[in-house]
Design a protein with these regions (language model features):
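Nucleotide-activated sugar donor-binding and catalytic core shared by glycosyltransferases
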Residues: 1-393
Length: 393
């Protein structure tokens, strides 16, 4: 179960489906449901309002976050909003595993599935994508009756145990949950040079600043480009605008009027993992998927705090900033200051990159799949459990 609040939750749902297909072929069936927006009008409005806030007024998410926390009481033991749709899905599909990758799809949902199918016939699991604990870590993530709780980091795991009293026996740490191509499509030095010069039309002897955005297109590109332009002899820019066509056209127009700064502009694309490999640093909000790809490819992060930082984004930023492994800006002048410093003292940027590289941890998404499929396997009567064949990894 997922929901399109931002793009990260959907990305992890897609990652689960693709890894299952890669490892087990067609022996394991996966159904992905956008449960919040498909089950009720109120849920659909809440998702749209979240994405509006992310684009236009991140500061407004603080009172919104407090409001959403109330769902933990509303859904304490049953689904309140969208219950009819959810119940129909459970009755018709009869899943052996209900997996939630969204904070608002745990409490009540697991109890409802067990009530319909029988406790012995279904298992329930959560993959929590937060990097750290504290303000922004929603209590809705933690349903105490969960069978398996998967945490991205040990820091976040410890918070779930100490703050929300989750049984330590139910929680494991498994790192990132990225799609298979992230681990498969690694550019060689020659391919990187060719991608920069031919695909992007940029120079291979200048640092590339990646102005990233999520699928919804929240960005401050036009505010940041003038600051980068002042250091056009050292830096060039790769800009992605997501599904924000208005931003795409405005950045394209800015590029035409400012030919001194080398710039490549993209709308929505499926090459983020390639862009990350050719970039020297990325400027992004605290979206967990983009930051996970940046960490995987050792591309240092500047957190975009223009307009405020949303509660969940604070957790990601805190995880990296606590070891001085990233930077954060709240206005364009902050970016200008950083670029001036790195231009005059290149060793300081190298130190940042070294600290960021040290934050990297190894992860094997296939382990998550084995954990979850084994859990689903346990929901079958022992005599009916098929011998699953691994076809790839």
């Amino acid at each position: 179960m997922t929901s399109s609040t931002g793009g990260g939750h959907d990305a992890r749902a897609v990652a689960f489906r693709r890894w299952v297909r890669k490892i087990y072929g067609w022996e394991v069936e996966v159904r992905v449901e956008s449960m919040l927006e498909d089950s009720s009008r109120i849920g659909r409005f809440g998702v749209a309002f979240y994405n509006f806030i992310q684009k236009c007024a991140p500061w407004l998410h603080h009172p919104y976050f407090v409001l959403v926390e109330g769902l933990s009481y509303l859904n304490r033991s049953r689904v309140t909003l969208g219950r009819r749709y959810y119940s129909e899905v459970i009755r018709n599909y009869k899943p052996h595993l209900v997996l939630s990758v969204h904070d608002c799809l745990n409490r009540g949902y697991f109890q409802e599935a067990r009530a319909i199918l029988g406790k012995e016939n279904v298992r329930c699991a959560t993959y929590c994508s937060e990097y750290a604990g504290g303000y922004g870590y929603s209590r809705n993530w933690v349903e105490p009756s969960v069978d398996l709780y998967i945490s991205r980091t040990r820091t976040a795991k410890n918070y779930a145990v100490t703050r929300y009293k989750l049984d330590p026996e139910k929680i494991i740490v498994r790192g990132h949950f990225l799609v298979p191509r992230i681990y498969e499509e690694k550019l060689s030095a020659f391919e990187r040079h060719r991608f920069i010069t031919e695909r992007l039309g940029l120079r291979s002897d200048r640092k590339i600043i990646f102005l990233a955005t999520g699928g919804t297109g929240a960005n401050n590109h036009l505010s940041l480009l003038p600051a980068i332009k002042q250091y056009s002899e050292t830096f060039q820019v790769l800009v992605v605008c997501g599904r924000n066509n208005e931003a795409f056209m405005k950045v394209r127009n800015w590029k035409r009027n400012n030919p001194d700064l080398r710039c490549h502009v993209e709308g929505y694309c499926n090459e983020m993992h390639l862009f990350m490999q050719v970039s020297d640093l990325v400027i992004t909000r605290g979206g967990t998927t983009t930051c996970s790809e940046a960490l995987h490819y050792e591309c240092p992060i500047i957190f975009n705090g223009l307009g405020g930082v949303m509660p969940q984004e604070k957790l990601t930023a805190k995880y990296f900033l606590q070891d001085e492994s990233a930077e954060i800006i709240s206005k364009p002048a902050d970016l200008e200051r950083l670029l001036m410093e790195w231009n005059r003292f290149p060793e300081r940027f190298r130190d940042l990159k070294r600290r960021f590289r040290n934050m990297r941890f190894k992860d094997r998404p296939s382990e998550v799949i084995y954990d979850l499929v084994d859990l689903a396997h346990d929901a079958l009567p022992e005599r009916e459990r098929p011998a699953l064949k691994v076809v790839g990894e």
